[in-house]
């Protein structure tokens, strides 16, 4: 696997084909658990682990599974890995597991995981499949984390609250309150706020993509006629 392959997979997972901002997959957990940073980070890490491990497992067994039972077999693999993550969370982060509730078992049915297993892991080697799962999971987790941080900041005026649920008592003092007198904005932590914030993030990404595309065209010498005309007016003072 070449360095170019690694870069291409990384760009797709983190930005160009991001599961949350481009593919719009996994919206149920993305919107349902992103009301705080700790919830978003906990579910994001769990999803990333399941996605990376399931891609590796699917790639390993892809030659031994027939076409007729491929999807049920993939779902079984994902379900086993999700159960393992669920048991680990019950053992080490039980309070966070209780907060996340049904969203942990629902990782099994997350379209991001099954989609990558079918579209990529079943057609590539273990290394490529594992890296794709890791980067797709990381891209999904980052969107969850940004969304959770923004909603927590706007809704409650805090950041990193209750991080001890994930990292233990040592993280109890990680809470940040930038505006002590801020009373909070209830809409931000309600479901409508999740839709609004996700829409704004998608719009921001699209705008950045447009700016990058325009800059690439300019650097390549493909400047639009109207822009060339404006540049000529600034130089000559004559409108043609």
Swiss-Prot record:
It is found in: Cell inner membrane. The complex is composed of six subunits: RnfA, RnfB, RnfC, RnfD, RnfE and RnfG. The chain crosses the membrane at residues 41-61, 71-91, 95-115, 130-150, 184-204. Keywords: Cell inner membrane, Cell membrane, Electron transport, Membrane, Translocase, Transmembrane, Transmembrane helix, Transport. PANTHER family: ELECTRON TRANSPORT COMPLEX PROTEIN RNFE (PTHR30586), ION-TRANSLOCATING OXIDOREDUCTASE COMPLEX SUBUNIT E (PTHR30586:SF0). HAMAP family: RsxE_RnfE. One of its GO terms (cellular component) is plasma membrane. GO terms for biological process: electron transport chain. The keyword Electron transport applies. Part of a membrane-bound complex that couples electron transfer with translocation of ions across the membrane. This is Ion-translocating oxidoreductase complex subunit E. It holds the Pfam family Rnf-Nqr. It comes from Pseudomonas aeruginosa (strain ATCC 15692 / DSM 22644 / CIP 104116 / JCM 14847 / LMG 12228 / 1C / PRS 101 / PAO1). Its EC number is 7.-.-.-. It is a multi-pass membrane protein. Belongs to the NqrDE/RnfAE family. It is an enzyme of class 7 (translocase). InterPro entries: NqrDE/RnfAE, RnfE. The lineage of its organism: Bacteria, Pseudomonadati, Pseudomonadota, Gammaproteobacteria, Pseudomonadales. Its main location: membrane. The keyword Cell membrane applies.
